[in-house]
Amino acid sequence: MSNLEASYNLILNNLREISGIEDFYFKPIKPKLSDIELISLIILAEFKSIDSEHQLFREIKGFEIGPNIERSVYNRRKRKLFPFIEEIRMKMVDKLNESENYFIVDSMPLEVCKISRSFRSKICKDVDYAYPNKGFCASQNLHFYGYKLNAVCSISSVFQSFDISPASVHDIHYLQDIKLQMSDCVLLGDKGYLSQTIQLDLFKEVNIELETPKRKNQKDYKPQFYQFKKYRKRIETLFSQLCDQFMIRRNYAKTFQGFKTRILAKIATLTTIQYLNKFLFGRNINNLKINLI
């Protein structure tokens, strides 16, 4: 058995234990490869940085599951499994973030194509509600065309929740979504989330204390607590890992459904490796560039 197949079996056994279900939705003809086996294959591909499906099917040719699925079916079923991958991810997150009270919110740009090609590009323009558009990332001083990944992570570097918005949407609007997902915690953000109205609203509605650094020209200015500044770097490190190891900025999807499924697959893989590191291997959860077998 190859190292790759052994890693696949390890991921599969743990995901089976977490989900407790083999198939998640009805199929008139039962496929040879179950849904949980397919999700394990998706996680393996992202962990090994195999971003080409053609390359993935060459790699698994000698696997026991190799003849059980075709490439076209793999892609179609992968998109249908989007809500179930997120469901499994949330089960892992609930265990990893069980005793967390401090979280960090931030965003990063997801470029679909260069601005010069944006007028003739047809990528992700298949649905009206999710058209990509032009935006600006202040931290990188970057004008880009595409989407923003808005995310919340714990101080132990586990993504609690995330969302994708068009590039032009201001970061602060994501806080309205957070209100429906979280409560009774401290949320750390940068100056982009500075708003007294939203700060009061979050506290009154769901008891979330929003902590942001204040601008130097504000009347009640005082430097932010040093430990909070240090915590805020955690999410930036996570974004760097998504870009480096999981190649989140490399996009081959043509539809929005395909695009968001790729993003979820990468974040779910990150969470899976963190889960295995903590509960199976007993090591630092953020040792991501490490062999499973």
Segments from the language model and where they lie:
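Short alpha-helical elements
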Residues: M1-I293
